[in-house]
Amino acid sequence: MTFAELNEVRTLKKQIAAAKQKIAALRDSAESVTTKLKPTPKGTTVKSRLEMLAALTVDTEAEINNLQARLQQAVPALTEKILAEVHNNAEQTLMIYRYVACKYFRDIGFLMGYSERRVYQVHEQILKKIAVDCS
């Protein structure tokens, strides 16, 4: 298992969040487009700006759908890999919290009754056991 495979779910979730923020910004822009509030260059009508914003919104929504489909495939695949390569139940739980649920080490420690430092130590030991190169 590679570090990229471990972080795939986290990366997809970040990309989805960024795309959702982009859609929110595009919708805000579309709502504020008027000739009185924002001067537009000659030849650019409000209608064409709205069409451009609508097209960008549709493209971004399609990107989100694609990312969510990839995420739906990545979660079970990563869970399966973790369960296959990590044999201790507590270690499996830690890895699933970290890489599937995308929890912070502090939160994992709280959920599992460990100190944050202990979570880091156990995590490091697991990575060494499964020979993940984090560089």
Role assignments for model-derived ranges:
Residues 1-84, 132-135:
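N-terminal interaction/assembly modules
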Residues 74, 78, 89-91, 122:
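N-terminal positioning helix adjacent to the helix-turn-helix/winged-helix DNA-binding module
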Residues 87-101:
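Short amphipathic alpha helix immediately N-terminal
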Residues 107-112:
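Short alpha-helical "recognition helix" segments of helix-turn-helix
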Residues 119-130:
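DNA major-groove recognition helices of helix-turn-helix
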